């Protein structure tokens, strides 16, 4: 992971936001954004990787992140990474694909979410979710080939 003052701030906020959450397999949820951040190669993508589920899955808002001093590019990418319940999943993915920060983070997020070693038993619901992730990855990778 890249360690700068800004990434350390995001790391602490991520930990605080997710500290009491667990993932579908019962592991501390915070391991997921930490893993995604480990895949990133620059400060901006590392910060967004750490914060990518904070607004969607916790009580934090974009305004809270702005108050913490995160810049416009970070806030825009986090906003794009935040899936609103009323938006079809692939429409949400299509909206973020033209933002290079959000696209890089989402690809790593999808790869980690598709990792069978962290899923456990693969039932029909999980198969459908994995298929949805596969389509999302194809959509994002299609954009990067232009």
Residue ranges and their predicted role:
Residues 1-146:
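Active-site helical microenvironments for divalent-metal-assisted chemistry
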């Amino acid at each position: 992971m890249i360690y700068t003052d800004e990434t350390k701030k995001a790391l602490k906020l991520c930990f605080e936001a997710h500290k009491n959450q667990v993932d579908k397999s019962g592991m501390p949820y915070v391991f997921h954004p930490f893993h995604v951040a480990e895949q990133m190669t620059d400060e901006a993508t590392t910060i967004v990787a750490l914060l990518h589920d904070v607004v969607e899955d916790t009580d934090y808002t974009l305004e809270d992140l702005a108050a913490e001093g995160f810049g416009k590019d970070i806030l825009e990418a986090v906003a794009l990474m935040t899936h609103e319940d009323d938006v079809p999943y692939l429409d949400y993915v299509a909206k973020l694909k033209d933002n290079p920060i959000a696209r890089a983070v989402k690809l790593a997020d999808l790869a980690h979410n598709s990792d069978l070693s962290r899923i456990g038993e693969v039932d029909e619901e999980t198969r459908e979710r994995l298929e949805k992730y596969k389509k999302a990855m194809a959509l994002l990778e299609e954009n990067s080939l232009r």
